[in-house]
C-alpha cells in the first residue's frame, strides 16, 4: 500500500485478528520502493487513471491552419482520505504519493477544484502531456500491463502516438479519428484476451 487507504487495510487486519487468534496478521507500513519496481502504479491507474486523445483544428483569425492531435495520460484523486490516518500510516493527504507520481513522470502536480450545486471537490492531478513523460508512461505500462479496459485504451493511445510521429497526412488523421470515435466511453467492443496471459500461482 502506498496511499492513505492503508488505514482501511489495517482496520480490516485488526478486525480479523480480534476474531481469530490462530495467527496474528502483521500490519506492514507503506511501500516506499521505487514506483517502477512493481505493478502498484498499474493497479492505481486501473482505478484512477485515464488516457485521452484530442483532435482539434488550429485557426488564426478565423482561417484554418491545420488539424492537431494531442494525447494525455492523467491521474486525478481527491486530496484527502475520508478517515483519520495516523502519521505512522502516512497521514490522510494524497499529496505525497501524487507528488511522487508526478515526479516519476517528470511533470508538475496540479490542484483542481470542482463545484456542484451543494458540494466542492478538491483533487490532485498529474498529467503526462509531452514526449518525455509519454516515453516514461509507455515504458512503465509495457513492463507492468493494465488489467481493466484501460489496457485497451492504452494500446489505442499508443497507436495514435505512433501515427502522429512525423508528418500528419490525411490517411493517418483518418485512422486517428476512427480510433478516437470508439475510445473510452464510446467503445462498444471490448477484447479482454490480454487477461489470458495472467498467471496465478497458489502458494501453500
Predicted regions located by residue number:
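Internal intein/HINT superfamily modules and their associated LAGLIDADG
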Residues: 1-204
Amino acid at each position: 500500500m502506498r496511499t492513505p487507504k492503508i488505514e482501511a487495510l489495517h482496520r480490516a487486519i485488526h478486525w480479523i485478528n480480534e476474531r481469530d487468534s490462530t495467527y496474528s496478521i502483521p500490519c506492514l507500513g507503506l511501500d516506499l520502493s521505487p514506483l517502477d519496481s512493481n505493478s502498484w502504479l498499474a493497479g492505481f491507474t486501473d482505478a484512477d487513471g485515464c488516457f485521452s486523445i484530442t483532435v482539434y483544428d488550429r485557426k488564426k483569425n478565423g482561417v484554418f491552419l491545420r488539424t492537431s492531435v494531442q494525447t494525455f495520460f492523467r491521474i486525478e484523486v481527491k486530496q484527502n482520505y475520508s478517515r483519520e490516518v495516523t502519521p505512522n500510516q502516512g497521514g490522510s493527504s494524497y499529496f505525497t504519493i501524487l507528488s511522487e507520481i508526478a515526479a516519476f513522470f517528470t511533470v508538475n502536480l496540479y490542484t483542481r477544484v470542482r463545484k456542484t450545486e451543494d458540494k466542492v471537490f478538491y483533487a490532485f492531478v498529474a498529467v503526462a502531456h509531452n514526449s518525455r513523460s509519454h516515453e516514461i508512461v509507455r515504458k512503465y505500462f509495457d513492463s507492468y500491463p493494465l488489467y481493466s479496459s484501460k489496457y485497451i485504451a492504452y494500446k489505442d493511445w499508443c497507436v495514435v502516438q505512433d501515427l502522429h510521429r512525423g508528418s500528419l497526412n490525411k490517411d493517418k488523421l483518418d485512422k486517428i479519428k476512427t480510433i478516437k470515435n470508439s475510445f473510452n466511453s464510446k467503445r462498444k467492443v471490448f477484447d479482454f484476451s490480454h487477461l489470458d496471459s495472467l498467471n496465478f500461482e497458489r502458494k501453500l
